[in-house]
Amino acid sequence: KVGDFVYLFTNKGILYNETTYKGDKEKIIPLVNDEKIPSGCIYVQNHANSEFIAVSVNVKKPTEIVDQMMVMNASVNVYMGTDAIYLYSTEYKKEKAYTNITKFQYNDGYMSGVASKTVKGEITDVFAISESNNILRVLTTEWDEQSKNRLYMLDDKMQILGKLSGIADGEEIYAARYIGNIAYFITYHNTDPLFAVDISDPETPKVIGELKITGFSDYLHPYGK
C-alpha cells in the first residue's frame, strides 16, 4: 500500500497447452474484475512462460480498478521501490547466468513501463536489490569456472552508472543489505567474509571494509547504528 493505493501482484505459470492454443485468443486473456485486460496494458518479453499481473485499487473506491497491466515473461521476482516496480528474472545463455530487470513507474495508482537492463550474474538474495534516490543497486553472483561477484549502480533510465567487480571471486553472495550509503554483503566460505562497500558515489563504488566471521551466514539484519 502506497498512500491511498493498494498494488496487488499475481504470477501464474503458463502451461504447455496454453502456448500452443489455436482457438479463440480472447478466451485465454486473464480477467481483472471480470473484464479482460486491455491489449494496451499487456507487455510481452522474450522467453515468456508466465503471466505477471499488477493491479492497483484506491482504498477510497475499493470496487474500482485504477490501473492494470500484464507482463508475459519468465518467472519473475518483484522489488517495489519508492516510485517504481522492478521485475527481475534469471536467464541462462550458453550456461552463463544473466539477470533481466524491467522497470515500471507508478504514481497515484497508474503504472507505465520505463526501461529494461540485463546484467551479468544472478541475484541470490532478496535484499541484494534496492533503490535509493532513483539509483538501483544490484549485487549479483556469476557462476563460471570461478564464480564472480559484482555490484551494479543503475540510473533512473536503467543505464549503468558504476560497477564494482573482483569481489571474493570463487565465492557466492549469500546475504546482503543496503544501509544508508553502505552496501553490506556476505559471501560463502568456511569463514564467511563480510564486505562493506561505499556507494555514496554511484559511479565509483569501493570496498571500505572486510571482516571474517566464523560460521555460516545467510541473512543480514540492521540493528541500530
Predicted ranges, named:
Residues 1-225:
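Beta-sheet-rich non-transmembrane sensory/scaffold domains
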